[in-house]
C-alpha cells in the first residue's frame, strides 16, 4: 500500500526520484539516462504557414486601422500616456514641464513689461513686482524657482504687486497638479508588472497523449522566480475560423478550452513547473480531431496565465500560443523535477523537451466508441527508451488484433466481441 501511494504521488508530481545515498557529485558529472526528444515540427506537404494571432511573447498581431474617433484616446489621457513607449513618455514628461515654465515665465515678463519694471532696472527708488527681473531669461528662471519650490534667491516677489501675488498662487496650484499627474504617470509606468511576466515560462510545444486512459492536450508552465504568483489561474482559448450552418463565416472564432475550471484545477500553486491538461471529451473542440486531421487543421491555442505579484499585489498576466504545427501528437513532457537531499531541484534544461509515447492515432470520439464496444486495448506497451515507438505499436496491434484459437483459426477482436 505504501509503495502504491508513493508511485501515485510521483506520478502526480511527474518527478524522477534519484537516490542520494552516495556522495553528491557535480551536476555536470551525473550520468542521466538519455531520452529521445523532439523539439521540431515540420509542416505537412502542401500546408502553408499561417499568420499567428498571438506571438510566443504574448504580443497580439492585431493592428487597429481607420480609427475615426481618435478623440476617445484624449478622454482617457492618463491611460494613453501610460501606454506610450518610454521614449515618447519621457518626451511628453520633459515637454510638459518646459512648456509650463515657459508659459508662466512669459506671464511674469509680461507683468514686468506692463508695469514698466524693465524700464527701471537698477533704479533704487523704483519698487518692481519682482526684484532683479531684467528680461525674459530672468523671468523664465523665476518661473522655474516658483513652480519647483526650490526657494527664492536673487529674484523675489515684492508686496506692492497684487497681480504678481495672484499669479504666484495660480502657478503654485497648477504646478502641484502637473507634478501629481506626471509623477503619478511615471510611477504607474515604472511599477507595471509587465516585466514580471518575463520570468513566467510556457513550453515551446503542446502535446496530445493518453493520461488516465483518455486523450489529453497538455502544455507546461513554470516560474523562474523564488517569489511566487499569488492566486494564479490558467485559461485557454481555441482560435479557429469557422462557418455557421447559415453560411456565415466567422474569422478567428474564439472557443473556451476547459483546463480544469469545473474542478478547480485551473487554480495553480506555481512553485514548480506544472503540466496543464485539457481532457478531450464531448465538450472539447478536439473531440473529432484525429492525428491525420491535426496535420490538416489550421488553428491556434492561446493560453493565459494570470495572478498577483507577491511583492506588489498587482495583477500580472503572461500569454503564449501554440499553432497547429506546434501541437505534437503522441508525445509527453520530460520530467524536470528531481528529489535531492533535503529539497526538490528543477532542471530547466529539459523544460521544453518531449519524448514519444504510444498514443492511438484515432480521435477521442472513436476512442470512446471503441471503449464502449469493448475494443480498447487493455494496455499499450511502453516504447523503448531511445525510440522504436512505431515498431512497438505495430507489434501491440498485431498481438491484439488477432488471436490464435485452439483449432488454429484466427479470430479478430470484432468477431470475438460479437461472440
Curated annotation (Swiss-Prot):
Keywords: Ion channel, Ion transport, Membrane, Phosphoprotein, Potassium, Potassium transport, Transmembrane, Transmembrane helix, Transport, Voltage-gated channel
A GO BP annotation: potassium ion import across plasma membrane
Domain of life: Eukaryota
Locus of motif Selectivity filter: 149-154
SUPFAM superfamilies, per database record: E set domains, Voltage-gated potassium channels
Chief localisation class: membrane
Signal peptide bounds: none
Subcellular location, record wording: Membrane
Biased composition range(s): Polar residues: 409-419
Site (Role in the control of polyamine-mediated channel gating and in the blocking by intracellular magnesium): 179
Tissue specificity remark: Most abundant in heart tissue where it is found predominantly in atria. Also found in brain, kidney, liver, spleen, lung and thymus.
GO function term, MF aspect, one: inward rectifier potassium channel activity
Function description: Inward rectifier potassium channels are characterized by a greater tendency to allow potassium to flow into the cell rather than out of it. Their voltage dependence is regulated by the concentration of extracellular potassium; as external potassium is raised, the voltage range of the channel opening shifts to more positive voltages. The inward rectification is mainly due to the blockage of outward current by internal magnesium. Can be blocked by external barium. This potassium channel is controlled by G proteins.
Xref: PANTHER family: G PROTEIN-ACTIVATED INWARD RECTIFIER POTASSIUM CHANNEL 4, INWARD RECTIFIER POTASSIUM CHANNEL
Subunit structure, as described in the record: Associates with KCNJ3/GIRK1 or KCNJ6/GRIK2 to form a G-protein-activated heteromultimer pore-forming unit. The resulting inward current is much larger.
Protein name: G protein-activated inward rectifier potassium channel 4
Source organism of this protein record: Rattus norvegicus (Rat)
